[in-house]
A protein has these predicted regions:
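Pyridoxal 5′-phosphate
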Residues: 1-139, 147-429
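Short, flexible loop/turn elements at secondary-structure junctions
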Residues: 21, 110, 208, 407, ...
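Secondary-structure boundary elements
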Residues: 165-167, 195-197, 524-540, 580-585
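Conserved hydrophobic/aromatic beta-strand scaffold that supports enzyme active sites
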Residues: 239-241, 356-358, 470, 565, ...
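Fe(II)/2-oxoglutarate oxygenase catalytic core
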Residues: 429-546, 555-558, 598-603, 622-623
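Catalytic core of Fe(II)/2-oxoglutarate
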Residues: 587-627
Length: 627
């Protein structure tokens, strides 16, 4: 299906893997937006030909959305975002919720957009608020017990249902958590909730589900359902489904003269519809028809035959998407099974799942991994993704790396992602450190002079200049700089400049051919490979990060080289290479064991290199001063 996506074709060397943040847009959507601006850019319900075109478009759009959702007994409200639609809904429901001090149940594993509005109302009106929390059984699990680990996280339906009582006014559910990716059985949950209290209203956030699964608001018997089309090949327009029998108690939050209106659109659809984005939905309809044709939909084997956009077609489309994306899940499942250094935050029981993978690494900060993936052509993302409550609950400080896929991703792309993720491993070996002085006194003039062209490091107060690059070192005679990588360290490792993005200019590409530089790189790789081989680990290291740093002083005052003190850098192995020393004293490298007891000290001289196991050892460097 990539042929329909201009962006995918333009950036064919990139892998789009941040689709849960927003999908790419097919040409049919773009063409319909263009068509609207040329032929229908007007107000609806008028007598002009342009206005009539728009009115007809809006009727067709409503028919399309109703078919997509199987809406038979409700109304669709349009808005710019689900966040805004839910906020509006909460205000419209406020008086209904506070009658008899109604109780509200909210999940702690959903996007914040469907949580904060109702939490705010509960606090304002002193309503009882219950939290349905993800079960975290990690403390009860043994690290080496894979059977237990499969139940590390659990979405327990019984826990939710036990919270429902005769005074429960509202339950909010994510159809899919945008972190976990697991699909909740919405139909079952709504049925069970209403068995316990038929008056309880249920709001479902379908934003993360819509791109992957069939929506059926009628079958669910849901009261409210929200989704966003920009997550499913559309523009930034969102919808709120309201079941018909919920319209009587919703209050007007719009202009005062709509107070007595029976039209719920006028009460809740503030500012009307964004006609540009709404009209583009007809392009999404065209794209989905082409999708069905691609898979030989039974009514479209004759390409000249018109295809009706009906529920049968919608069911066919989503069956193909779900089956195709299930293979993505199997591929990622194999990755996790075979790599103990990676954890996917998900429920690993029998729950179905969409291709959203929130990943943690044993030895790497997710933000650093994300920056590297982006430079390698994989568009992923990292952070909390507005699931801060879940992150706090699980004590995940810096968020997760999120890989989120769509039906236009290929199996080759998924395999490439998995191959790259496997670079980020933690090596538990007994190696501590090694010093090398083979190149002592023979650093090339070219390499020495390159230090004078570095830019000032604005992140440190001392006199420091720096360059920084991600290098492809697969061929030592053809080392390449990859992209323009920003540098990031967690505050777990750097208490001075942690948790911030630092921008440095790439090192000079000319030194990549320098014999001394290549020697340093090759010696570093040889040392690591030898130590890994001793531990029966065979790995081919393809990428390294290189910092080129010059620190100088022009006074008798000491300059602190390492303001963060005794520390680790957050990698498997590091190498410190001395290019030259000139008229300074100090800069003594200290190496410490895991208890931070000093085990070795040395003053690196020109051409010397220290290789250190950063998983086991700590290090610091003493200040310098003029000699």
């Amino acid at each position: 299906m990539k042929k329909f996506f201009p962006s995918l074709n333009k950036y064919e060397n990139l892998i789009f893997a941040d689709n849960a943040g927003g999908s790419q847009v097919p040409e049919q959507v773009l063409n319909n937006l263009n068509n609207f601006l040329i032929n229908s850019y007007s107000q609806p319900t008028g007598n002009s030909i342009i206005s009539k075109n728009l009115t007809a478009n809006l009727d067709n759009i409503n028919e399309f959305v109703n078919t997509l959702y199987n809406n038979k007994y409700g109304l669709i409200i349009y808005g710019g975002s689900c966040t805004q639609l839910i906020y509006n809904l909460s205000h419209s429901m406020e008086n209904y919720l506070k009658v008899n001090k109604g109780e509200i149940i909210l999940p702690n594993f959903s996007h914040e957009s469907c949580v904060s509005p109702f939490e705010r109302i509960a606090k304002k009106n002193e309503l009882v608020l219950h939290w349905w929390n993800l079960e975290n059984n990690s403390e009860n699990n043994s690290e080496n017990n894979s059977e237990n680990n499969s139940e590390k996280y659990k979405i327990n339906y019984n826990t939710l249902l036990n919270l429902v009582n005769n005074n429960t006014k509202l339950v909010v559910l994510p159809h899919v958590s945008n972190i976990l990716g697991n699909i909740l059985d919405i139909k079952y949950l709504i049925s069970e909730i209403k068995k316990k209290n038929s008056d309880t209203k249920v709001l479902v956030d379908g934003v993360a589900y819509m791109p992957h699964g069939l929506i059926d608001v009628t079958s669910y018997n849901v009261d409210y359902y929200v989704s966003s089309f920009y997550k499913f090949c559309g523009l930034r327009i969102s919808t709120l489904y309201i079941k018909e029998d919920n319209m009587t108690y919703l209050e007007n939050i719009n202009h005062y003269f709509f107070n007595n209106s029976e039209d719920i659109n006028k009460k809740l659809q503030l500012g009307g519809v964004n006609f540009e984005c709404a009209s583009s939905l007809l392009g999404l309809k065209e794209y989905l028809i082409e999708f069905a044709r691609f898979f030989n939909y039974e009514e479209s084997k004759n390409s000249n035959k018109e295809v009706n956009f009906d529920r049968t077609l919608v069911q066919f489309i989503y069956s193909k998407i779900f089956y195709y994306e299930k293979i993505f899940n199997n591929l990622f499942k194999n990755l996790i099974t075979n790599n103990e250094n990676i954890e996917v935050i998900e429920c690993k029981d029998e729950m179905q799942k969409v291709p959203i993978y929130s990943i943690l690494f044993k030895n790497y900060d997710v933000n650093n991994v994300n920056l590297i993936l982006n430079e390698l052509g994989i568009i992923s993302n990292s952070g909390t993704f507005y699931c801060n409550r879940l992150m706090d609950y699980l004590n995940i400080k810096n968020g997760v790396l999120r890989i989120s896929l769509m039906h236009y991703n290929s199996f080759d792309e998924v395999n490439k992602i998995i191959e790259t993720l496997n670079y980020f491993k933690k090596y538990n070996i007994n190696f501590q450190f090694k010093c090398d002085s083979l190149y002592k006194g023979f650093v090339t003039t070219n390499l020495k002079n390159s230090f004078y062209n570095l830019e000032v490091d604005k992140n440190y107060e001392n006199k420091r200049t720096r360059g920084y690059s991600l290098l492809d070192i697969e061929n030592i005679d053809d080392i390449k700089i990859i992209g323009d990588l920003q540098f990031y360290q967690s505050s777990n490792y750097n208490n001075v400049n942690g948790d911030i993005l630092r921008n440095y200019k790439n090192i000079d590409y000319k030194i990549l051919k320098d014999d001394c530089f290549k020697y340093f790189v090759n010696t570093f790789l040889t040392t690591i490979n030898n130590e890994l081989t001793k531990n029966s680990i065979i790995e081919k290291i393809k990428y390294i990060q290189v910092h080129q740093i010059r620190v100088y002083t022009d006074s008798e005052n000491e300059v602190n080289l390492v303001p963060e003190g005794i520390h680790q850098d957050g990698y498997n192995f590091i190498a410190m290479c001395c290019a030259t020393r000139k008229n300074i004293s100090g800069a003594i490298s200290h190496i410490y064991d895991e208890s931070k007891n000093i085990v070795h000290s040395l003053q690196l001289q020109e051409g010397e290199m220290l290789v250190l196991n950063d998983n086991k050892m700590f290090h610091s460097v003493s200040p310098i001063q003029l000699s």
